[in-house]
Swiss-Prot record:
GO terms for biological process: iron-sulfur cluster assembly. Its main location: mitochondrion. It comes from the Eukaryota. Keywords: Mitochondrion, Nucleus. The lineage of its organism: Eukaryota, Amoebozoa, Evosea, Eumycetozoa, Dictyostelia. Required for nuclear and mitochondrial iron-sulfur protein biosynthesis. Pathway: Cofactor biosynthesis; iron-sulfur cluster biosynthesis. InterPro entries: Complex1_LYR_dom (IPR008011), Complex1_LYR_LYRM4 (IPR045297), ISC_assembly_LYR (IPR051522). PANTHER family: LYR MOTIF-CONTAINING PROTEIN 4, PROTEIN C6ORF149. One of its GO terms (cellular component) is nucleus. This is LYR motif-containing protein 4. It is found in: Mitochondrion; Nucleus. Belongs to the complex I LYR family. Disulfide bonds: none annotated. The gene is lyrm4.
Amino acid sequence: MSQKSVVLHLYRSLVRESKKFSSYNFREYSLRRVSVGFRENKNKDQNETKELIQDALKNLEMVKRQAFINSMYSTNKLVVE
């Protein structure tokens, strides 16, 4: 896979997992961090991109765990939802 397709796959995976948060605040924060983080790093060189991909993979696993934990302890919906 080319680096561009790996990055795109990571972005989509992070967005998909971020949408699984049951809490509105966590969900919106996570989606915002994903989009801002990818936008900030879109013009990095290949060596930096490889390191950022490794960081994003770790973050993806963290988001998966946190979304699961958040769904286990869900609360009532907020008014904004």
